[in-house]
Swiss-Prot record:
Major localization class: cytoplasm
A GO term, aspect molecular function: lysine-tRNA ligase activity
Gene: lysS
Protein name per the record: Lysine--tRNA ligase
SUPFAM superfamilies for this protein: Class II aaRS and biotin synthetases, Nucleic acid-binding proteins
Subunit relationships: Homodimer.
Alphabetized Pfam families for the sequence: tRNA-synt_2, tRNA_anti-codon
Catalytic activities: tRNA(Lys) + L-lysine + ATP = L-lysyl-tRNA(Lys) + AMP + diphosphate
The keyword Transport belongs to this UniProt entry's keyword annotation: no
Binding site for Mg(2+) 2: E417
Localisation per UniProt entry: Cytoplasm
Keywords: Aminoacyl-tRNA synthetase, ATP-binding, Cytoplasm, Ligase, Magnesium, Metal-binding, Nucleotide-binding, Protein biosynthesis
Any one Gene Ontology cellular component term annotated for this protein: cytosol
EC code: 6.1.1.6
Length: 500
């Protein structure tokens, strides 16, 4: 046991002893729930922070505040609530009473204070402790010196402590909430209807990914946590809801990384009588508007770069992007779609670039891997990548001029994918054959290939109007808006391996 752990255990024991000793003389077993706050810290700072000491004395304003003690500075207590911090002042008689009633207060304790608002000699607002009540005794101490929790793993495992002591973390999740609200409001103004579709699927579909499998006891059958809501949302378009969206969780049984969490949030939407170009225009409008609304500017810092959401955004085909970011590779510079269709050529090219290939990869998969290894990470500014091959886009409509590719794009910022959209495949027979090709791929060893969904084919046979649909990764978008570089910093409780 380390010295630090021993010290912490000693403090915990001392605090437990304090709580045990004060319980008999406190109401509600020392956990009262009768105190009512009248003002938050930020409200008082905003309304009275500019007043002079004399003005506040003359005003004689009384208030009730409540929050967690974050520091003790002589007779002053720094109290933190959801909005910010404010001080409370304990004159000598109050200090003696606190010691008598509660054996003194500790950092981390939650208290309620009622009294007159004053201004200190240093110009800080404070509430005189005329009435006060210990609301919750903190049995565990906050991190050393309260300069913030810096151990990354502890921050994620004990997010509650991280939020108490790290203002930056609190603000990141406030921004996340604002981003989601702004997206929702934008979609509603565009006449999209918010819907909810199943989280447990009989057949996993809507994306190429490995699902989580569970078991429904009453029905005695396996079920899958959804990897995407796509097929259910398109069923709604078949049913006549022409503009729908959903903000919810997806689950993919895959690895962890700075940009991947097995449980993540997506906003997915579908609009009838539109194509993938309309989606790109809508995405530009959405992102530029919420950036200006939330940050006051279409430009924002991201690491060493400045990302400009103002638009128009760059648009390149996947082949064009590979050629742009491999200027010195003569083979790539001369590459045509006819060569992209040549499996042996694509395998040799991938190997020459140091890419470890799988035997079941198609031409489209090889092209996507080459793009991912050589071009994707260089897409710092908002960029739409189009021209995705049909064999890696089983739900997307084929391009009218080049059937090898589809009317699909992925949207990149900061070197990572943030959104995926396409004109939907509404040809039931083509969808049937592509589902069958996915089944063949799964049989060949691709465990991320899709299942065959007969009911979805039946839905398409009733007629899906020309439709475009898109998914936007909320977590990755929030990473941009908060200038953070790991997805765990924007997910309140990220997936973690259990502690030994």
């Amino acid at each position: 046991m380390t010295e630090q752990v021993q010290d912490e255990n000693k403090l915990i024991a001392e605090r437990r002893a304090k709580l045990d000793s004060i319980r008999p003389n406190c109401s509600a077993n020392a956990h009262p729930n009768t105190f009512r706050r009248t003002h938050k810290a930020a409200e008082l700072q905003e309304k009275y922070g500019q007043n002079t000491k004399e003005e506040l004395e003359a005003l004689g304003f009384r208030t009730s505040i409540a929050g967690r003690i974050m520091a003790k500075r002589g007779p002053f207590l720094v109290i933190q609530d959801v909005s910010g911090r404010i001080q409370a002042y304990a004159e000598k008689g109050v200090q003696a009473d606190l010691k008598d009633r509660y054996q003194g207060l500790d950092i981390g304790d939650i208290i309620g204070v009622t009294g007159q608002l004053h201004l200190s000699g240093k110009g800080d607002l404070y509430v005189n402790m005329e009435e006060y009540q210990l609301l919750t005794k903190a049995l565990r101490p906050l991190p050393e010196k309260f300069h913030g929790l810096t151990d990354q793993e502890t921050r994620y495992r004990q997010r509650y402590v991280d939020l108490i002591v790290n203002e930056e973390s609190r603000q990141a999740f406030v921004m996340r909430s604002k981003v989601v609200a702004a997206i929702r409001n934008f979609m509603i103004k565009k006449e999209f209807m918010e819907v909810e579709t199943p989280m447990m699927h009989v057949i996993p579909g809507g994306a190429s990914a490995r699902p989580f499998i569970t078991h429904h006891n009453a029905l005695d059958m396996p079920m899958y946590l959804r990897i995407a809501p796509e097929l259910y949302l398109k069923r709604l378009v078949v049913g006549g809801f022409e503009r729908v969206f959903e903000i919810n969780r997806n689950f993919r049984n895959e690895g962890l990384s700075p940009r991947h969490n097995p449980e993540f949030t997506m906003m997915e939407f579908y609009m009838a009588y539109a194509d993938y170009k309309d989606l790109m225009d809508l995405t530009e409008e959405l992102l530029s508007s919420i950036a200006i609304e939330l940050l006051g500017s279409a430009q924002m810092p991201y690491g060493e770069h400045t990302v400009d959401f103002g638009g128009p955004y760059a648009r390149l085909s996947m082949l064009e992007a590979i050629q742009k970011y491999n200027p010195d590779n003569a083979t790539i510079q001369a590459m045509t779609y006819e060569q992209v269709k040549d499996l042996e050529f694509m395998r040799e090219l991938a190997i020459s670039l140091g890419i470890k290939i799988e035997k079941f990869w198609t031409c489209g998969q090889l092209l996507e891997e080459i793009f991912g290894e050589t071009a994707e990470w260089q897409l710092m500014q908002p960029t739409f990548i189009t021209g995705y091959p049909a064999d890696i886009s089983p739900l997307a409509r084929r391009n009218d001029d080049n059937h090898f590719i589809t009317d699909r794009f992925e949207f990149f910022i900061g070197g990572r994918e943030v959104a995926n959209g396409f004109s939907e495949l509404n040809d039931a027979e083509d969808q049937d054959s592509r589902f069958k090709a996915q089944v063949d791929a799964k049989d060949a060893g691709d465990d991320e290939a899709m299942f065959y969904d007969a009911d979805y084919i039946t839905a398409l046979e009733h007629g899906l109007p020309p439709t475009a649909g898109q998914g936007i990764g909320i977590d990755r978008l929030v990473m941009l808006f908060t200038n953070t570089h790991t997805i765990r910093d924007v997910i309140l409780f990220p997936a973690m391996r259990p502690q030994a």
